Structures are given as C-alpha cells and as structure tokens.
Amino acid sequence: MTKQTEYKRKPEWLKIKLNTNENYTGLKKMMRSKNLHTVCEEAKCPNIHECWAVRKTATFMILGAVCTRACRFCAVKTGLPTELDLQEPERVADSVVQMGLKHVVITAVARDDLKDGGAAVFAETVRAVRRKNPFTSIEVLPSDMGGVEENLKMLMDAKPDILNHNIETVRRLSDRVRARAKYERSLEFLRRAKEMQPDIPTKSSIMVGLGETREDLIEAMDDLRANNVDILTLGQYLQPSKKHLPVLKYYPPAEFAELKEIALSKGFSHCEAGPLVRSSYHADEQVRSAKEKTAEAK
C-alpha cells in the first residue's frame, strides 16, 4: 500500500461528534440577526460544534465575508468585497456582551482593495469591544494588511491583548499554498508587532499535511522564535473541497505530541498541537498561559 493510498480516508481520530444544542442554534440565529460572520462557519472549522455548543465561544470575521485573496487551502469566498460596514464594530461589541464572552477572537478577510487593509475598522472593533466589555480579553487575527507598517501600527495602538498572524505553512511550500501572501512578510509583520508593543503576546499557526517534512517544521519554528513569537498552534490541514490542495498526510495524535515538545523546547510560552487544533482553538487558555509566563519572567 502506498503512502498516498494510506492517507486517502480520514482516520478515526478526525471523526467529530456533532453537538447542536440550544447554545449552538441560539448563536447561529444571533449571528444572522446581527448580520455578522464567523470564521467558524466561513472556513468550515471542524471545532464549531464544540466551541458554539459547549464552550459558547466564537471567532468573529469582520470586513465582510469575501476575501480578495484565493489561498489554495482556504474555504472563505473570494472575489470583489462589499463596501465597508462602519456599524460592524458596535454590532460585534454588542454580540460579545450578549454571549458573555471572557475572551474574543476577531479576524478578517484580506482586504487588498483598501489602502489601510481594513486596519481602521479592525482597530475600531477592538476599541468598541473594550468599551462595552472591559473585562473581556481580545485577540486579533489580521491578514498582513499589505505589509504596510502604518496599518499594523493603527491596529497595535488599539491595544489588543494578543496579536495573532498565521504563517500557515512552512517556507518551502508557502508560495504554492498562499501565493498572495509572503512567508518573509508574515515574519516581518510578527516581528514589527512585538517591537511596537513588547508586552502584547504574539502568536502564529501552521497547518500540517501539505507535504512538509519534520525539518521544514523545525525551520518554521526557529523562524517564528527568531521573530519573538510567543505562542504556536499546530493542526491538521483538511481539504475543504476538491478545488483545494489535497491532504498528503494525516498526522496521528502521537506525532502532534512530539511536535509540541519540540516547540516548547524552542522557547514558545505555549503550544497547542493536535489533529483538530485551529488558530483560535482554546484561545482563552493560550492567552492566559502566555500572560502567566510573561509575569513569571518579570
């Protein structure tokens, strides 16, 4: 049996028990009523039922639901985006109140059609959530916003509790996996964020199963640490449709455990690694862990 045939079917550890209790259905109705989007739905996250039904958490996706890029791993719609909705920040903030969230993740589609990459609306969303939810920690997950330093500064000046920007894959595969984004530009984005606000933890995520080697992954970890990234998440890539890149390998849980140990040995303050781990998975626990370790270091 060839390796390709061996990984044709999803293994047992990727089978998910669906839970659509009243929390799940209630959150879904609320999102629709407020004309809000979540990356949980748009990117077909495998953890949506756990997060919505059990943990009652969600990751808001602002700046519309249409992305200007067409990364070959991503299920989010691509094309010409809609006009900016300047009332969106307040609706997100109101939803955080209604959901009673202790930690919220705010992400966005890439808006290469905008000079600021959507930074102004992103920053205002952070401020709106902070005004109405002063005890809620806020994590932001932006695109590289064109690599423009002023755009990043606008966002960092809003003082999120954590800055997350994903390199998504290893250096060797980056151009094939996300042609409109650049590996080095993402590293620079993360480095600049830390330079602008040294006390704000930074975070990044890598998908596995796209053809990377163990050496590729170790190189990516070293690159992130060299740019002072604090938190790393590692998860299994799952093909959203036949139009997207195929899965070349399904990593077993034991291999994720090995990768986590390697990451922690590199100096990451926290590493979340597992088949169903996504960038926002258990994000509240990640930011708490990072802050505790930062306090200990002082």
UniProtKB/Swiss-Prot annotation:
List keywords of the entry alphabetically: 4Fe-4S, Cytoplasm, Iron, Iron-sulfur, Metal-binding, S-adenosyl-L-methionine, Transferase
Localization, per the record, is: Cytoplasm
Positions annotated to bind [4Fe-4S] cluster 2: C67, C71, C74
The pathway this protein participates in, as annotated, is: Protein modification; protein lipoylation via endogenous pathway; protein N(6)-(lipoyl)lysine from octanoyl-[acyl-carrier-protein]
UniProt-listed NCBIfam families:
lipA (TIGR00510), PRK05481.1 (NF004019), PRK12928.1 (NF009544)
Q: What does the record give under GO molecular function?
A: 4 iron, 4 sulfur cluster binding; lipoate synthase activity; metal ion binding
Question: Which CDD domains does UniProt cross-reference here?
Answer: Radical_SAM (cd01335)
Broadest EC class assigned to this enzyme: transferase
**InterPro entries xrefs:** Aldolase_TIM, Elp3/MiaA/NifB-like_rSAM, LIAS_N, Lipoyl_synth, rSAM
Family membership noted in the UniProt record: Belongs to the radical SAM superfamily. Lipoyl synthase family.
Cofactor(s) in the UniProt record:
[4Fe-4S] cluster
State the EC number(s).
2.8.1.8
Please indicate which superkingdom the organism of origin belongs to: Bacteria
Q: Which reaction does it catalyse?
A: [[Fe-S] cluster scaffold protein carrying a second [4Fe-4S](2+) cluster] + N(6)-octanoyl-L-lysyl-[protein] + 2 oxidized [2Fe-2S]-[ferredoxin] + 2 S-adenosyl-L-methionine + 4 H(+) = [[Fe-S] cluster scaffold protein] + N(6)-[(R)-dihydrolipoyl]-L-lysyl-[protein] + 4 Fe(3+) + 2 hydrogen sulfide + 2 5'-deoxyadenosine + 2 L-methionine + 2 reduced [2Fe-2S]-[ferredoxin]
Q: How is the cofactor bound?
A: Binds 2 [4Fe-4S] clusters per subunit. One cluster is coordinated with 3 cysteines and an exchangeable S-adenosyl-L-methionine.
Binding residues annotated for [4Fe-4S] cluster 1, in chain numbering: C40, C45, C51, S280
- Which gene is this protein's source? lipA
**Species this chain originates from:** Bacillus cereus (strain B4264)
Q: Which Pfam families match?
A: LIAS_N, Radical_SAM
Where does the record place the Radical SAM core domain? 53-269
**Could you state one GO cellular component term attached to this entry?**
cytoplasm
Q: What is this protein called?
A: Lipoyl synthase
